[in-house]
């Protein structure tokens, strides 16, 4: 029987496997940030251990950083301590750090692919749940806890059980204006926020192949939001063209050899998946979440569902609770719902194509009265490229705030957050209660939809603005 891409990647990295034992995998890349690493480095220090492979470990500051100043003190005492600890730990253990003043600094899941640290066929881990992003390159990438961070630092290995396999095929062509964010939200709307639990998901189909690498990263970034361990897209010419010439990508003859190997990284025709889900891309409209998990999502032109319409009692109770928290009524359209803030950024949607899509809507328009809208590029290079293209001027002239790179309002760990009761159109990945600030209300959308909400003051169908 043939193997799935996941099974090939897993088997290629087994260091040791014995009966009744969890396999030990080799880890090719370890990405580190300031929040989940301090205790891991302390553990190494306490045991007198070194980082096993410092050349395969890369660190950056992203979660806590201010997006308004490069001052390490700007986000508060705990943030300052965590960032200073990262500086100290990376210097002591010989780990490459992209600190606040480094031109490549940015969100860990943006800079990894951008610099070519992320390559097909790799195993990649990070103390962050959205490590699945890197699976867009055909790498097995997943988030780990702090104790596992320490284990990888010390041994460059990790014990991992085998996951079940899921194929999500998106057939046909997406309509104009439909993005990877809309596709993945529609997928999660179909599977539910726990539909992928215990699985590694492979995304495939004509609509997936048509996505750019940045679109595929958005897709895999949110695999975790359906409960999956990781998300994968098999590498192809789109992948190779994106990677060629990047800092850590192979060069010259090594490049040719790498591409020859990478081209083998795909599921066999006779591979068996445990679960198969199919969607028609032509049926997908711009998506907006209405509840408090990414699976509570509808097309922008649909009505908010009545909790009584859910046959499952758990879903019914969850919907009722979500509507109460979000202060929404069933039967109304999201296009009638006003917003207070707009956030364009995060490891889901802060790359150059995302900013271009938002700027296209913002150009020649103004942010609605009473709305605060911020645009946070995902890295220094993204910010530089956007400014070279004049996107910063488009946003600023429209009334958006143009910020420095960082995780920003995706999570309430820095100064960018919602006040209680504020409603936000956000390009991030989680709409949980309090995710963007205590009692804040988060609606997940694409960058273009976020820009449309900013200039209209409410959720708007971006297809009507183009």
UniProtKB/Swiss-Prot annotation:
InterPro entries: 3-IsopropMal_deHydase_lsu (IPR004430), Acnase/IPM_dHydase_lsu_aba_1/3 (IPR015931), Acoase/IPM_deHydtase_lsu_aba (IPR001030), Aconitase_4Fe-4S_BS (IPR018136), Aconitase_4Fe-4S_dom (IPR036008), IPM_dehydratase_rel_enz (IPR050067), IPMI_cat (IPR033941). Keywords: 4Fe-4S, Amino-acid biosynthesis, Branched-chain amino acid biosynthesis, Iron, Iron-sulfur, Leucine biosynthesis, Lyase, Metal-binding. Gene3D superfamilies: Aconitase, domain 3. Its EC number is 4.2.1.33. GO terms for biological process: L-leucine biosynthetic process. CDD domains: IPMI. Pathway: Amino-acid biosynthesis; L-leucine biosynthesis; L-leucine from 3-methyl-2-oxobutanoate: step 2/4. [4Fe-4S] cluster binds at residues 347, 407, 410. It catalyses: (2R,3S)-3-isopropylmalate = (2S)-2-isopropylmalate. PROSITE patterns: ACONITASE_1 (PS00450), ACONITASE_2 (PS01244). The keyword 4Fe-4S applies. It is an enzyme of class 4 (lyase). GO terms for molecular function: 3-isopropylmalate dehydratase activity; 4 iron, 4 sulfur cluster binding; metal ion binding. Binds 1 [4Fe-4S] cluster per subunit. Its cofactor is [4Fe-4S] cluster. The keyword 4Fe-4S applies. Belongs to the aconitase/IPM isomerase family. LeuC type 1 subfamily. NCBIfam families: leuC, PRK05478.1, PRK12466.1. Heterodimer of LeuC and LeuD. Catalyzes the isomerization between 2-isopropylmalate and 3-isopropylmalate, via the formation of 2-isopropylmaleate. PANTHER family: 3-ISOPROPYLMALATE DEHYDRATASE, HOMOACONITASE, MITOCHONDRIAL-RELATED. This is 3-isopropylmalate dehydratase large subunit. It comes from Pectobacterium atrosepticum (strain SCRI 1043 / ATCC BAA-672) (Erwinia carotovora subsp. atroseptica).
């Amino acid at each position: 029987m043939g193997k799935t891409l996941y099974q090939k990647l897993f088997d290629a990295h087994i260091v040791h496997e014995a009966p009744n034992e969890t396999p030990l995998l080799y880890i090719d890349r370890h990405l580190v940030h300031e929040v989940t690493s301090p205790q891991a480095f302390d553990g190494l220090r306490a045991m007198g251990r070194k980082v096993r492979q410092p050349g395969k470990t890369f660190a950056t500051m992203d979660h806590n950083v201010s997006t308004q100043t490069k001052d390490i003190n700007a986000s508060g005492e705990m943030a300052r301590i965590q960032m200073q600890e990262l500086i100290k730990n990376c210097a002591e253990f010989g780990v490459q750090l992209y600190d606040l003043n480094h031109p490549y600094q940015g969100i860990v899941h943006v800079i990894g692919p951008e610099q070519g640290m992320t390559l097909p066929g790799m195993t990649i881990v990070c103390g962050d749940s959205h490590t699945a992003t890197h699976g867009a390159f055909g790498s097995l990438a997943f988030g780990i806890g702090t104790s596992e961070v320490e284990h990888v630092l010390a041994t460059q290995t990790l014990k991992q059980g085998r996951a079940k396999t899921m194929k999500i095929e998106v057939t046909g062509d997406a309509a104009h204006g439909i993005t990877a964010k809309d596709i993945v939200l529609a997928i999660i709307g179909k599977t539910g926020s726990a539909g992928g639990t215990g699985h590694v998901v492979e995304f495939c189909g004509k609509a997936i192949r048509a996505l750019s690498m940045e679109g595929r990263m958005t897709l895999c970034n949110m695999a975790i939001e359906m409960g999956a361990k990781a998300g994968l897209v098999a590498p192809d010419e789109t992948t190779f063209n994106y990677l060629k010439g990047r800092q850590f990508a192979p060069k010259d003859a090594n490049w040719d050899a790498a591409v020859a190997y990478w081209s083998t990284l795909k599921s066999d025709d006779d591979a068996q998946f445990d679960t198969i889900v199919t969607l028609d891309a032509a049926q997908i409209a711009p998506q907006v979440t209405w509840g408090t998990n990414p699976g509570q999502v509808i097309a922008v032109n649909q009505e908010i569902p009545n909790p009584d319409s859910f046959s499952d009692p758990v879903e019914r109770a969850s919907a009722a609770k979500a509507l109460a928290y979000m202060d929404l009524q069933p039967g109304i359209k999201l296009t009638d719902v006003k917003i207070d803030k707009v956030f364009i950024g995060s490891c889901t949607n802060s790359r150059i194509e995302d900013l271009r899509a938002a700027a296209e809507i913002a150009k020649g328009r103004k942010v609605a009265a009473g709305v605060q809208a911020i645009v946070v590029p995902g890295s220094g290079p993204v910010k530089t490229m956007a400014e070279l293209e004049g996107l910063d001027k488009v946003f600023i002239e429209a009334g958006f705030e143009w910020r420095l790179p960082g995780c920003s309002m995706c999570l309430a760990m820095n100064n960018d957050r919602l006040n209680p009761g504020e409603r936000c159109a956000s390009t991030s990945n989680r709409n949980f209660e309090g995710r963007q600030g205590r009692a804040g209300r988060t609606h997940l959308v694409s960058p273009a939809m976020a820009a449309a909400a900013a200039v209209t003051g409410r959720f708007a169908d971006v297809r009507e603005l183009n």
